[in-house]
Amino acid sequence: MKISVSKNDLENTLRYLQAFLDKKDASSIASHIHLEVIKEKLFLKASDSDIGLKSYISTQSTDKEGVGTINGKKFLDIISCLKDSNIVLETKDDSLVIKQNKSSFKLPMFDADEFPEFPVIDPKVSLEINAPFLVDAFKKIAPVIEQTSHKRELAGVLMQFNQKHQTLSVVGTDTKRLSYTQLEKISIHSTEEDISCILPKRALLEILKLFYENFSFKSDGMLAVVENETHAFFTKLIDGNYPDYQKILPKEYTSSFTLGKEEFKEGIKLCSSLSSTIKLTLEKNNALFESLDSEHSETAKTSVEIEKGLDIEKAFHLGVNAKFFLEALNALGTTQFVLKCNEPSSPFLIQEPLDEKQSHLNAKISTLMMPITL
């Protein structure tokens, strides 16, 4: 093959592909990027056994079609050092030659036929995403998922598809908290009325880098494939049964408080400078924040005024993990939030008020959280 390509287009695509390379074993075909020139397009692939990405860029000129491979890390290292002008890529015998002006680099290739095939699936479920609400849900739920969880089912995000009602539930948990949302009015095509899959967190994070809107999602139960005009991404799914999260959601709450999000974030941040756990006290006209630290004598306290006042007869105390509480608040797209509680020792819920409008492009996330024992 022999082509000329834009330096910027090539470099941007190579950066996307880095996450899919085996950088520990340079002798592995998985350390290489597969190149294929067809007419005026250069297709680039990187893959290991669990995850992969195929992208393309347009060539500036194509003198000869063909295939080749090149060490992905070294390829990016070279391209990123070159000037912002076109680059010539040419295969010669068992090497790939990179040229720009008076600079030339020659790197060995592997047998392109040994590169793993990009999977083609017969989907059991598929949907077209024309707005960023799914990516928004992934972004907001990602912090809740532990990638190294000893329970492999919890090392990913649960996606529950319901074809009858055209809804998609997205759920993540680390056993200390659980975040979930239900996306509605989406176009789901499925071979079954109810079907679910568990997407690994690693895959979720790569999807956030590559896709925003106008893409498709397909799954056959073992693999998931996500595609748009320039990228095709695949991942193995986590094989296992996700816990029935509906069973742990309280049926009702004895108390419900509507509170200012930014004021609470400020109070929690101030107290969390000394401790990761905080005692929250709600009174009729005030919210009090106090750091909890049993090992040292250090303390931090602050309070915020509740303008509208709470319908509360006596003070309500709650122990919270500062980091978890802040992440739950950051997932909300409203200026206020609702805190729903039962006993101080029972799980509590953080969600958006039903009567406050937010962008229809945002996912409405609810987070159930275990309290800290006071």
UniProtKB/Swiss-Prot annotation:
Gene Ontology, cellular component aspect: cytoplasm; DNA polymerase III complex
SMART domains xref list: POL3Bc (SM00480)
GO molecular function, one term: DNA binding
Transmembrane annotation, as ranges: none
Keywords (A to Z) from UniProt: Cytoplasm, DNA replication, DNA-binding, DNA-directed DNA polymerase, Nucleotidyltransferase, Transferase
Gene Ontology terms describing biological process: DNA strand elongation involved in DNA replication
Database matches in InterPro entries: DNA_clamp_sf, DNA_polIII_beta, DNA_polIII_beta_C, DNA_polIII_beta_cen, DNA_polIII_beta_N
Main location: cytoplasm
Pfam families, sorted: DNA_pol3_beta, DNA_pol3_beta_2, DNA_pol3_beta_3
Subcellular location field: Cytoplasm
Family under the similarity heading: Belongs to the beta sliding clamp family.
Purpose: Confers DNA tethering and processivity to DNA polymerases and other proteins. Acts as a clamp, forming a ring around DNA (a reaction catalyzed by the clamp-loading complex) which diffuses in an ATP-independent manner freely and bidirectionally along dsDNA. Initially characterized for its ability to contact the catalytic subunit of DNA polymerase III (Pol III), a complex, multichain enzyme responsible for most of the replicative synthesis in bacteria; Pol III exhibits 3'-5' exonuclease proofreading activity.
Quaternary data: Forms a ring-shaped head-to-tail homodimer around DNA which binds and tethers DNA polymerases and other proteins to the DNA. The DNA replisome complex has a single clamp-loading complex (3 tau and 1 each of delta, delta', psi and chi subunits) which binds 3 Pol III cores (1 core on the leading strand and 2 on the lagging strand) each with a beta sliding clamp dimer. Additional proteins in the replisome are other copies of gamma, psi and chi, Ssb, DNA helicase and RNA primase.
Name under which the protein is recorded: Beta sliding clamp
